[in-house]
Amino acid sequence: MAVSAPPVISATSSSAGVPGGLFRAEPLYSSPGEPPRLTPNMINSFMANNHNGSVLGGGIGGGSGGSSNTNTNECRMVDMHGVKVASFLMDGQELICLPQVFDLFLKHLVGGLHTVYTKLKRLDISPVVCTVEQVRILRGLGAIQPGVNRCKLITRKDFETLFTDCTNARRKRQMTRKQAVNSSRPGRPPKRSLGVLQDNARLLPHAVPGLLSPGLITPTGITAAAMAEAMKLQKMKLMAMNTLQGNGSQNGTESEPDDLNSTTGGSESSWDKDKIQSPLAASGPQHGIAHAALAGQPGLGGAPTLNPLQQNHLLSNRLDLPFMMMPHPLLPVSLPPASVAMAMNQMNHLNTIANMAAAAQIHSPLSRAGASVIKERIPESPSPAPSLEESHRPGSQTSSHPSSSVSSSPSQMDHHSERMVMMPNNREELIVDQDNGQSIKKFQRDNKEEVPAQIPVMKSPLDKIQLAPGQALHPGFPGPFIFADSLSSVETLLTNIQGLLKVALDNARIQEKQIQQEKKELRIELFREREIRENLERQLAVELQSRSTMQKRLKKEKKAKRKLQEALEFESKRREQVEQALKQATSGDSGLRMLKDSGIPDIEIENSGTPHDSAAMQGGNYYCLAMAQQLCSA
């Protein structure tokens, strides 16, 4: 599947019903929320190697990828308000990617994508759901974020209606807030007092060049922190300029504010300029952006071209794909790092490109450099590349190009006629003077005259500026660059952060293991305590049962003892009675003896009834003997 690139559509043709000053065909500055863009020529050369169904960046599938209708899967790059957006042709209608245009045009107007869907329902607009192949293509191009598996398409007319509705709603909110602020009624302060000021195309002051860089502009506008950082940067820049102008005389040509804005950097991505690879490039010198691994051709004054090896290497590293957001000023646009590992991979790619650039510069002969202007080795990627070893001499009209953009206007060619390059093997610099002929001058580095300026986020480019007596910087001295050493420091910082994260992760794992071990030990101890408690409960139950048994036995013993005591008392009473009877019997025997002794015959006694008494006495004696035997046996 080949992605065709239609001709560039002018911004006026697609901006009907939209305020004219809101969008620019070539804006002076591009915020990180705005994705970089590819020119049609670059897209054609980019897709030439992938015509046979190869995968672009792991995202664009070939024509044999399971879709019967290849026309609906043909992605086109169209111009929408001066920005290249992805579109598909379905049923004769041109449909553009809704999440992409939301990030580009609607993100600063509404609260989120859910608000857009609510407005679409209210406006009776139904977007078209993308197929799997279309989502894969958009994800490969970077129109949608990695990991997104669904997307919707919308027509141009519906988008213009939606944009007009969002703009009107925002104006109403602003008017309501102004009325609330001006009114004397107490209430809640406005929600976005320091948020979005005006449209991003009209945010930047044109009187002070280089005040704001795109790394400081958030996708939703300029925040208070960004403004403070910009003012701090501008103050440091002005101090450095005053110091450098005091050490030497100024020998440059004054530039216009537009030229200064074009040379201060951070304005546009390398995809913004369609003139880089246009046929007009061969007619005269054009200060375009080249890849880090390239040098200018000796006999041509046009833009440098790409050889297939370097182009394939850069394309495999995803360094010139469009539509990628920039989540942080120091991290590249081409790959939004969802993790530290992704950022580290990107830094490794940048280091590889830096090595390639150094090798290409070392092996390039000096005789070929004398015949033409030596091009700066600035990468075409909008990301801060480590190969920006461009040195600036104050005595010549040097151009100060940032790592993200270079303006190709003719007025810039008038002010920048000399190009310089630094040789990495020694500490000398070669300056080619185009106006005075093919003469090469050597200047030794003077470390005493270097003016370092510390910038909070990145190293100052003033560390690489070499001064000589009687020389001064160009008036349009740009904002800070990011050189190889600053990128190495960033890489070191990211490596340290990754190490800290790894240590923190290891500590968290160790703590989690310790917690799990403690939980296991506590669980085992709890089981032991439960077992001991159950054993004690069993023993207590047995003891209670034995106690109840003993109590029952004790009651029985007490009852038996009571019965025995009662029987003993009864027997003691009987014994006393028997003893009394025996005493009475003994007393009766003594009376009989006295009668015998007195001479009374036994017959009278028997006649008087004494035999009956004697029989009773004998029975009592027998009873006493029986009771005595029972007591003895007991």
UniProtKB/Swiss-Prot annotation:
Residues 488-568 are annotated as: DACHbox-C. InterPro entries: Dachshund_domain (IPR052417), DNA-bd_dom_put_sf (IPR009061), SKI/SNO/DAC (IPR003380), Ski_DNA-bd_sf (IPR037000). Pfam families: Ski_Sno_DHD. Residues 494-588 form a coiled coil. Residues 171-194, 244-286, 378-416 are annotated as: Disordered. SUPFAM superfamilies: Putative DNA-binding domain. Its main location: nucleus. The keyword Transcription regulation applies. Residues 396-412 have a biased composition (Low complexity). Residues 244-269 have a biased composition (Polar residues). GO terms for molecular function: DNA binding. GO terms for cellular component: nucleus. One of its GO terms (biological process) is development of primary female sexual characteristics. It comes from the Eukaryota. Residues 76-162 are annotated as: DACHbox-N. It is found in: Nucleus. Transcription factor that is involved in regulation of organogenesis. Seems to be a regulator for SIX1 and SIX6. Seems to act as a corepressor of SIX6 in regulating proliferation by directly repressing cyclin-dependent kinase inhibitors, including the p27Kip1 promoter. Is recruited with SIX6 to the p27Kip1 promoter in embryonal retina. SIX6 corepression also seems to involve NCOR1, TBL1, HDAC1 and HDAC3. May be involved together with PAX3, SIX1, and EYA2 in regulation of myogenesis. Interacts with SIX6. Interacts with EYA2. Belongs to the DACH/dachshund family. The DACHbox-N domain forms a structure containing a DNA binding motif similar to that of the forkhead/winged helix domain. This is Dachshund homolog 2. It comes from Mus musculus. The gene is Dach2.
